[in-house]
Amino acid sequence: MKLLLAMALLQGMTAYAGEVRSNGYTARFDERIETAPGDLHGETVGGIRLVRTADQALVWQENTPLRPGCGNVAAVTAINDRYMALCGHLGGRHYTQKIIFTQGSSLSMASVDQYDSPSPVRVERNGSLAIDVLRRDLFPGELTGPHYFPTVYRLRHDDAMFGFLPSFDGDVAERYWLHYRATRQAAPAAEVLPELLASLLAAQSGKQSICAELDTLAADLQQGRQYDAQGARTLMRTWLHKLSAIGYPAFDTQACPGRI
């Protein structure tokens, strides 16, 4: 597997962004200026090409509004001898990763949006691919300011589908705990309660119990006497139900009896 990654300045109407050669294929992600009659400046867009390295035969091509590169995540990456990843953005925001399966003559592609927080694709211990996504604006009108809700997406690759699905099993629980701890340290509980509870719901399948953290959050909400004990637990219970309604696991009341 040979990785070639290059960056260049705008040359003519095209900027070369990156190229990867892996498992007999070459993937290239370019940035170019697209113009139409009457345009003064044109629009910056992207172009993706996949060719067989041996004979340079084109096997797949896509024109996309995505522009190559995602900050610290390269525009094109060879993950292993089966997968390549392409990452692009819409004018510096809303990042999207595309995963290409390149084994033998079989080619498949799956996409996952990472919104405004790009991160690399990970290879799990069992060989599957996973990626962390921080979703925002899940409760418009209820929450002000940026609130980031974590979801680990795992690539499902079988006869039924090739695509990313949310994962909340025990193998990814630690990823949710990492987000919980980082959020806990960044702001008071009352300011980030929904995303804290989302992380705890997502981590329920792990080995570590969430019960003690629920008690701590309830106590923190009572500091400054903004909430009494009943008010704090009512608020937490309300958000637990709302989070379950948008796809997070339901709260296991039997695992933490009497907490909420």
Spans of model-derived segments:
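Sec-dependent N-terminal signal peptides
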Residues: L3-G12
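Structural motif
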Residues: E43-G47, G92-I100, P140-V152
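Terminal domain-start segments
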Residues: Y16-C70, R259
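Repeated scaffold domains used in trafficking and secretory/extracellular systems
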Residues: P68-A75, Y115-V123
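Acidic, glycine-anchored loop motifs typical of Ca2+
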Residues: T77-A85, E124-I131
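Surface-exposed loop/turn elements that mediate protein-protein interactions on large endomembrane-trafficking
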Residues: I48-E62, K98-D113, T151-L165
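Beta-strand C-termini and the immediately following turn/loop, strongest in propeller blades
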Residues: L86-G91, L134-R136
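Acidic, small-residue rich beta-repeat scaffolds with periodic aromatic anchors
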Residues: Y16-R32, P37, S128-I260
